[in-house]
Amino acid sequence: GENIVYESTNDTANTRFDDGDTSNWLNALAEAAMMTGFERNGDIVKLAAYAPMFGNLRGTRQWAVDMMYYTNTALVRTPSYYVQQLFMQDSGDYKVQSELTFASGSAPTLTFEGSGTRGDASRTVDQIYYVVSADEETGDILIKIVNAGENSVRFNFSLAGMEGIQLADIAGV
């Protein structure tokens, strides 16, 4: 249920994970979706690492996609870098019970058609991934929502045992 990282057969630019020279927003969305699962299952997932981290922007590199690229004078951060930064800077101490209810009545999904090394089977995955946690020191409630699809999704959000909470800030990547 946590796997949004799946190769697509769409002809749209930057939809395949192996066709670019650098990380793109599709990579970053897939990573963010996966990381909501890491955080939601923090009692099981003790550690996660991102590799490879650095690649030479103008030279030979071992991997097709890295988190950051460098030259002699510059450091280029990819969308994946900013997703990692968001999850690092805004992680709670414990998970908060929550529920999303969708205006459509059911959770939206995405379907990918397999091809090449993945076989011919199609795969359906969730479009929305989320996690809610709380910072013990500040009392902040941290809500991370990833829409891995192209369409807007309307939903209501409820937090167990919490009423009258005011929205203080919205941060996005």
Regions found by a protein language model. Give the residues of each.
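Aromatic/acidic polysaccharide-binding cleft in carbohydrate-active enzymes
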Residues: 2-129, 137-138
